Swiss-Prot record:
Coiled coil: none annotated. The gene is recR. May play a role in DNA repair. It seems to be involved in an RecBC-independent recombinational process of DNA repair. It may act with RecF and RecO. This is Recombination protein RecR. The keyword Zinc applies. GO terms for molecular function: DNA binding; zinc ion binding.
Length: 201
């Protein structure tokens, strides 16, 4: 066990930062030292921003996104194509698609994927509201952007069956060669998916 090198307040900050995704103990220490070094220009504004947003965060009752308003910024954007609904597993997926600026549609966050091994069943996901949104009319296409894992694909098939009676067009993201990727560096599953999802030029 390593000895403490700073007071309990700093050690607590290190431990809390270490709980963030992608930050282990070493990275948390480096981040803490960086915050301390930049305490006037980074740490203080970060602390204020965290305090400001803490009491305002809400889950959008329409799509499941997180924001400081409900309905969220995405749902209230009148410039979006509300006839297209992109279904994602997590809020992080919604944000990733928005960063890519790939589509100007509305979203629906399931809150995970079906995973029998982890005890996640249909009742644990935001599926009822999805069926209600599609059933209310106005949605012409549902794009399943759920990833390529076995659980994600199982979820995609389940959602497709669930929406079959609505008559809505259901599509999913193509899987395959990433932009800038070289074929000899890809696994067989990715190559097979790329061949199956090929398009005409």
């Amino acid at each position: 066990m390593s000895r403490a090198v700073a007071g309990p307040e700093i050690e607590r900050l290190i431990q809390l930062l270490g709980r963030l995704p992608g930050l282990g103990p070493r990275s948390a220490r480096r981040a803490t030292l960086h915050l301390i070094k930049k305490r006037e220009t980074l740490m203080a504004p970060l602390g204020l921003a965290l305090q400001d947003v803490l009491g305002k965060i809400v889950e959008c009752q329409v799509c499941g996104n997180v924001d400081v308003r409900d309905p969220c910024t995405v749902c209230t954007d009148i410039h979006r194509d509300s006839s297209v609904l992109v279904v994602v597993a997590e809020v992080a997926d919604l944000w990733a698609l928005e960063r890519a600026n790939a589509i100007n549609a509305k979203y629906h966050v399931l809150g995970g994927v079906l995973s029998p091994l982890d005890g996640v069943g249909p009742d644990d996901l935001n599926l009822t509201k999805l069926v209600e949104r599609v059933g209310a009319g106005g949605v012409n296409e549902v794009i399943l952007a759920l990833g390529a894992t076995v659980d994600a694909q199982t979820t995609a098939h389940y959602v497709t069956d669930l929406l079959r009676e609505t008559g809505v067009k259901v599509t999913r993201l193509a899987h395959g060669v990433p932009v800038g990727g070289e074929l000899d560096h890809l696994d067989e599953g990715t190559l097979s998916a790329a061949i199956r999802a090929r398009t005409a030029l």
